[in-house]
């Protein structure tokens, strides 16, 4: 198993040990057997300028660390190579915001590190920076979390409830009374009249997916008409929905992809031409898609080479990303301005 990476690397967020402005074509940053213990279930969680790797409950971190978002307990501004994080317990879910990270264990306990300037970690307001993972005092047990730029949404074990914290000035905390003027430092419960199966967070918006397949969006409407998107996504054949900074995309049972929202960098252009897709990953303003032949495609914002095509022009039509000959891509992960793929040999 190999981990490939490309795109922005000014903080070392690709984890290859050699920080540079950008990497325009995929390169190998880890193998298994090796120090990262990669397997087909390993997950890469890219944040704003940092990256987490979760594999069998163990957590590794690389990149931007000025707010302690790598969870290493150090004053190191950036971490150029993946380093194992000393976490309180094995994590089963991890989400990365712009400059913070939250992990959840098998018992539904949440832990956070990084910036808490807006309450996004759910910790007391006196804690602005947290350099090691600290337990969050949650009112309920939680099963997953989605982190935006400055807010966090937790799916609770009680399936009709979420817990929210952070900045809610755009309405992204799903408050039924509308946007909040003050930051929410202590996680609060928001209850709905039906069961929630997934939570997603964009820059300043939140998307909830319910068990009846319907979707509900909250927050900044500048680049999206929420009612139109909710209608398009609330159908039975949607098998995966992902959100970017200011757009959303959905994968359907027939292998086709739809997208809506901001498109000035090509975020949603041309995705209708993708066929036989089995997985999508949506970054802040670019996207990745994997097809049934294990080929990888990219599109959208490409200022840092994050589309992996050998240049930095924005990509308005999905293009095939080429790894070394003979490689089969089995998963893909898009971040802010960086991208990752898990691959193995086709033989």
Locate predicted features.
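Eukaryote-biased RCC1-like beta-propeller repeat architecture
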Residues: 1-347
């Amino acid at each position: 198993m190999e981990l490939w990476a490309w795109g922005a690397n000014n903080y070392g967020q690709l984890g290859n040990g050699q920080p540079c402005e950008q990497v325009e074509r995929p390169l190998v940053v880890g193998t298994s057997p090796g120090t990262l213990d990669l397997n087909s279930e390993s997950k890469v969680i890219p944040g704003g300028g940092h990256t987490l790797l979760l594999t069998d409950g163990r957590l590794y971190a690389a990149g931007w660390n000025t707010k302690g978002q790598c969870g290493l307990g150090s004053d190191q501004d950036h971490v150029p190579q993946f380093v194992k994080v000393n976490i309180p317990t094995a994590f089963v879910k991890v989400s990365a915001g712009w400059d913070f990270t939250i992990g959840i264990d098998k018992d539904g306990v949440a832990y956070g590190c990084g910036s808490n300037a807006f309450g996004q970690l759910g910790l007391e307001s006196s804690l602005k920076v947290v350099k090691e993972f600290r337990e969050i005092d949650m009112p309920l047990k939680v099963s997953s979390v989605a982190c935006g730029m400055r807010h966090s949404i937790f799916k609770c074990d009680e399936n009709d409830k979420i817990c929210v914290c952070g900045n809610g000035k755009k309405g992204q905390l799903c408050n039924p009374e509308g946007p909040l003027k003050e930051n929410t430092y202590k996680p609060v419960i928001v209850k709905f009249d039906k069961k929630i199966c997934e939570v997603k967070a964009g820059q300043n918006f939140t998307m909830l997916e319910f068990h009846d397949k319907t979707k509900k969006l909250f927050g900044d409407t500048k680049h999206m008409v929420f009612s139109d998107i909710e209608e398009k996504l609330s159908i039975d054949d949607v098998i995966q929905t992902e959100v970017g900074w200011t757009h959303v995309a959905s994968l359907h049972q027939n292998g086709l992809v739809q997208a809506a929202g901001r498109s000035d960098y090509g975020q949603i252009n041309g995705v209708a031409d993708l066929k036989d897709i089995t997985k999508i990953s949506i970054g802040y303003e670019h996207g990745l898609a994997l097809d049934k032949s294990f080929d990888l495609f990219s599109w959208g914002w490409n200022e840092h080479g994050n589309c992996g095509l050998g240049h930095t022009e924005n990509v308005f039509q999905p293009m095939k990303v080429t790894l070394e000959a003979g490689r089969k891509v089995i998963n893909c992960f898009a971040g802010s301005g960086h991208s990752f793929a898990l691959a193995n040999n086709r033989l």
